[in-house]
Amino acid sequence: MHSNVGLAGLAGLLATASVCLSAPADQNITSDTYFYGQSPPVYPSPEGTGTGSWAAAYAKAKKFVAQLTPEEKVNLTAGTDANNGCSGNIAAIPRLNFPGLCVSDAGNGLRGTDYVSSWPSGLHVGASWNKALARQRAVQMATEFRKKGVNVLLGPVVGPLGRVAEAGRNWEGFSNDPYLSGALVYETVDGAQSVGVATCTKHYILNEQETNRNPGMEDGVEVAAVSSNIDDKTMHELYLWPFQDAVLAGSASIMCSYNRVNNSYGCQNSKTLNGLLKTELGFQGYAMTDWGAQHAGIAGANAGLDMVMPSTETWGANLTTAISNGTMDASRLDDMATRIIASWYQMNQDSDFPSPGAGMPSDMYAPHQRVIGRDASSKQTLLRGAIEGHVLVKNNHSALPLKSPQLLSVFGYDAKGPNALKQNFNWLSYSPAIQENHTLWVGGGSGANNAAYIDAPIDAIQRQAYEDGTSVLYDISSEDPEVDPTTDACLVFINSYATEGWDRPGLADNSSDTLVKNVARKCANTIVTIHNAGIRVVGEWIDHENVTAVIFAHLPGQDSGRALVELLYGRANPSGKLPYTVAKKAEDYGSLLHPSLPETPYGLFPQSDFDEGVYIDYRAFDRANITAQFEFGFGLSYTSFDYSGLQISNPKQSPQYPPSAAIQQGGNPHLWDNIVTVSAEIKNTGRVAGAEVAQLYIGIPNGPVRQLRGFEKVDVSAGETTQVQFALNRRDLSTWDVEAQQWSLQRGTYRVYVGRSSRDLPLTGSFTL
């Protein structure tokens, strides 16, 4: 909202809303007062309590803030210019030995500097389904941030969640499922902060498309940012879920998003900031704007916003003036400053932390101090992370692994490395369907990060060919290349691009599909690798008899080629699973294929109605009984696994609602009480060792037929059997009760499914609550 509304004014506000909302549907809306009341006001902004592990940090912070002048408090709340390459800076307070803060992009590696690594993207981590690996990636990636003097890592991403198939930033997040995203964001936050680098989990909340994400001008008239309109139940059960896991892990900051939520801008929305984040979830850190996402002054502060980036025109001295005239309580400013300083103490950045921005030159091409962020100890994690995010979805006639080929033919624009590797790689002012000039290892925008090197597929293949005495022919520019008929295999490389600022033009492109079909027409063993920054439909050629193997290679980071060769030659066994659903045709995504566009009467105030509720991705496909090309959770291996021995413990009989308790970070602590345990046995029935992702889905009464509620990735040697266990807590088994405003256990029969994917579930059972 553009104005601050207190609880006392709620009745009048809602009355106004009821009048406005009765306006004729064909009457163009020209004022945002029409929407007042759609996002309920929640005031005042709750003060941080220093609960749990935050107690010591809050005690120090309150003592620190008590010594500040009003101007010094204000300076903590907004970014300032600094002679460094940080994405944003908070000014120092030298007299109290506070050196300031450097905050920098992004969740997949440090951007805009040198001597750092390009890590597998969030989507790639999601495809690995590996919690331990996600944590190790976070630890080592954050260590690079620390060495460079970055206090706050602007990530990880769990918004967007992937509601819109063509959304431009889906690749930065982990998955289209809240449980998988939540499990991985927990490990990422916990891992990064274990080395003293604060995370800024983003984009809070409902930032599900890039189209109209910011206000803009249309024929000289301002068009507001898109409003994501959602009900309370869907908010909790889908989009808030992974943010709750991030808060539970202790995320030091949360970035509010550009879009509007129920027609109130995300960074001045008192319901989402004061109500959900700070009250219900017990968030102890600070809420930071996305860059340029501040659209109100004092109203934003009262709504729960704590920090503006990269600078502000509406706060500054206006905050102290507002306190003087009573528009804002002095306690609100104290709380803003306390939350920021408490997070600094919570990360132990007051002791032995590099100077903010020490390794972040403002100009990489001017003389600057060499600060090495990389470390040799991260090599294994970089490579393993790159390997495990590849998903093998087709492997007819055991085309893979390759078997001592004498001749390989390599085709496709995605096989080669870039012609130049520079600062701010992949920041484009548009979104092409493909990156046609080189292999794709990261998406575009602020999530794109600098690489120490790029190991392209063609380079890695030729290194292996040298070792094996294999001949390699290649044509990486032609759409209809010639093929030597004696070749053992044709390796075709294509990609699917996505970037911040733009939604994708489609889920496939004609040029790449034509290339695959042309090669397959001439080559009986065509193996396709797709570096995809999101869902890529393959219906044009997936059933071609000469397309023998297909790999969704996602965005593996700088070790792209090296990782791929490990898989192609069988030194590594594919273990990735799809973190999204691949449809047979794009139209199967229905209304969630494209972003929402402005329509009459809301042309000046674009609306995106989340009226599908929780039914996105596999939930939607299950509900409509649509057969997917490759379902959520699907992925092949060079071995095979059998499932048996399903066991379900006697559930702990529990009250419908969680017992009352003081809110901790993450919410009511009883949400994490275990109710029931499920276990199963997995046997490797093949000839080689492999890793399997065992997946648990639960059918909650009165909910979707199946929802992911557990997964474990286990290594199993050939012929061996291992057991997996899934502990189900109260939140896992609850639905959101809108009237009671509580998580509610349902009375009835819960269905249990365990297996290889969301639609390959050989073990079934049930229990009753």
Swiss-Prot record:
Q: What class of enzyme is it?
A: hydrolase
**Enzyme Commission number(s) from the entry:** 3.2.1.21
Query: What InterPro entries is this protein classified in?
Result: Cellulose_deg_GH3, Fn3-like, Glyco_hydro_3_C, Glyco_hydro_3_C_sf, Glyco_hydro_3_N, Glyco_hydro_3_N_sf, Glycoside_hydrolase_SF, Ig-like_fold
Alphabetical keyword list = Carbohydrate metabolism, Cellulose degradation, Glycoprotein, Glycosidase, Hydrolase, Polysaccharide degradation, Secreted, Signal
Question: Reaction catalysed by this chain?
Answer: Hydrolysis of terminal, non-reducing beta-D-glucosyl residues with release of beta-D-glucose
Question: Which GO BP terms sit in this record?
Answer: cellulose catabolic process
Q: Where is the active site?
A: D290
Q: What is its main location?
A: secreted
Q: Which family does it belong to?
A: Belongs to the glycosyl hydrolase 3 family.
The name of this protein is Probable beta-glucosidase M
Source organism lineage? Answer: Eukaryota, Fungi, Dikarya, Ascomycota, Pezizomycotina
